[in-house]
């Protein structure tokens, strides 16, 4: 995702959260008037993984999360609200979900912002437990990403939304006083968020490709069936025309 000037780690495809020494938080956005950028692909040989985190950085993540967790709801709410401003698509999705939820009091609607905030907190609880198991770690994140692929068709949810989420989360979390207390915690959270966003996007895009492939295959099969039905109808018509031309005996 990013290349960190303050860290030796290089991340995956997304490069939307490049860290520099400019600005109070060491974070510069590139590509637009505010410095935001779209992602660019990098080769897998340059990718950072969760295994690149040192033991002390993993400790720093867990310790800082315990301190941050009581304030997590407020932090994540700010992130999602900023994402709504940055992406009208997200605002529309949350609005529709809240509207549906107003008429459905049986179960929590997982698409609302409030439930997203709760689930994000729970997600980080589970994620930090799996820091030593990269397969489980990646699968958890990609599963979340793939679950959002269904929004691509009806709500125009796109990969650039993950990019923007990464930019906002990087700025909000990494500038939090709990995280900025130690250099190890700051570097670790930047690494974690960069990999997190990349895997979310990877899961989303992978599932989206499967949807498109399935849809394309279904269209081909449907086309074949329609062609066969049309051919059958034409053959029936030919038989009827032929029978009508036969002389009566």
From Swiss-Prot:
Region described as Disordered: 20-43
InterPro entries on file: Globin, Globin-like_OT, Globin-like_sf, Globin/Proto, Mb-like_M
GO BP terms: oxygen transport; response to hypoxia
One GO molecular-function entry: oxygen carrier activity
Positions bound to heme: 116, 148
Lineage top rank: taxon: Eukaryota
Regions crossing the membrane: none
Pfam families per the UniProt record, alphabetical: Globin
Protein name, as recorded: Globin-like protein 9
Gene: glb-9
